[in-house]
């Protein structure tokens, strides 16, 4: 059991890193990686959101959305001749359900940071509410559904996805701070050298792809 959880976690962090393997959440990844302190704050926020929303969406999927999930409703019906809930398939509601859960969690996190950590709240600015539509957050829930992780593994997977994304943005922020003091050719300054850096980081993480866990 522990080995399985460890395998899911390490794959989510290194082998299947959402930012550097699937290039999810690139908008926020590039925009908030100019400063290490801000990147750490956003990374922690993403870890919290992923750890909560992935298992929450797993419960919604397994108990309500997937085909046969509503079989328990038949126990409360007098007769199943008219309608049999065992045949109901609501997976088409997955996107809107997952986004609703993510939006609610981000709103709670936003209120928490505004109340207790106003400096970080102001530093993140518009990118904090944009976590709601960050495809890395939604992508983790969709991967969970596709791979049909049970609840325990979905918690570990969500945490691992958040840690992997946070690790990537903090590493990029550290490199970009060093690049400020480097002699970068004028045409490549700004996003140009940043794209090259992200590409090299992605190539480095590809070395983990051959690991079997």
UniProtKB/Swiss-Prot annotation:
Q: What is its main location?
A: membrane
Parts forming coiled coils: none
- Membrane-crossing residue ranges in chain numbering: 12-32, 40-60, 92-112, 124-144, 155-175, 191-211
What reaction does this catalyse?
A: a ubiquinone + n Na(+)(in) + NADH + H(+) = a ubiquinol + n Na(+)(out) + NAD(+)
What Enzyme Commission number does this protein have? 7.2.1.1
UniProt keyword Translocase present: yes
Pfam families from the UniProt entry:
Rnf-Nqr
Topology with respect to the bilayer: Multi-pass membrane protein
InterPro entries per the UniProt record, alphabetical: NqrDE/RnfAE (IPR003667), NqrDE/RnfAE_oxidrdctase (IPR050133), NqrE (IPR010967)
Under Gene Ontology molecular function, one entry of this record is:
oxidoreductase activity, acting on NAD(P)H, quinone or similar compound as acceptor
Q: Name its GO BP terms in alphabetical order.
A: respiratory electron transport chain; sodium ion transport
Keywords per UniProt: Cell inner membrane, Cell membrane, Ion transport, Membrane, NAD, Sodium, Sodium transport, Translocase, Transmembrane, Transmembrane helix, Transport, Ubiquinone
What GO cellular component term, any one, is given? Gram-negative-bacterium-type cell wall
Tell me where it resides.
Answer: Cell inner membrane
**Keyword Translocase on this protein?**
yes
Q: Summarize the subunit comment.
A: Composed of six subunits; NqrA, NqrB, NqrC, NqrD, NqrE and NqrF.
Similarity comment: family membership: Belongs to the NqrDE/RnfAE family.
**What exactly does this protein do?**
NQR complex catalyzes the reduction of ubiquinone-1 to ubiquinol by two successive reactions, coupled with the transport of Na(+) ions from the cytoplasm to the periplasm. NqrA to NqrE are probably involved in the second step, the conversion of ubisemiquinone to ubiquinol.
Q: What is the protein's name according to its record? A: Na(+)-translocating NADH-quinone reductase subunit E
Source organism per entry reads Rhodopirellula baltica (strain DSM 10527 / NCIMB 13988 / SH1)
- Taxonomic lineage: Bacteria, Pseudomonadati, Planctomycetota, Planctomycetia, Pirellulales
């Amino acid at each position: 059991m522990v080995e399985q959880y460890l395998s899911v976690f390490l794959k989510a962090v290194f082998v299947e890193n959402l930012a550097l393997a699937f290039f999810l959440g690139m908008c926020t990844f590039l925009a908030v990686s100019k400063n290490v302190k801000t990147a750490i704050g956003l990374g922690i926020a993403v870890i919290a959101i992923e750890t909560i929303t992935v298992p929450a969406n797993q419960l919604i999927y397994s108990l309500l959305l997937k085909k046969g999930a509503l079989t328990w409703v038949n126990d409360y019906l007098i007769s199943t001749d008219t309608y049999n809930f065992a045949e109901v398939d609501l997976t088409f509601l997955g996107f809107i359900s997952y986004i609703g859960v993510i939006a609610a969690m981000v709103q709670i996190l936003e209120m928490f940071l505004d109340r207790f950590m106003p400096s970080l709240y102001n530093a993140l600015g518009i990118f904090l509410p944009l976590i709601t539509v960050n495809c890395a957050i939604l992508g983790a829930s969709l991967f969970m559904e596709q791979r049909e992780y049970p609840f325990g593994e979905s918690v570990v997977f969500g945490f691992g996805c958040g840690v992997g994304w946070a690790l990537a943005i903090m590493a990029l922020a550290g490199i970009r701070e060093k690049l400020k003091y480097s002699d970068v050719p004028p045409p490549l300054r700004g996003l140009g050298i940043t794209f090259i850096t992200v590409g090299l980081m992605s190539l480095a993480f590809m070395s983990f792809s051959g690991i079997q866990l």
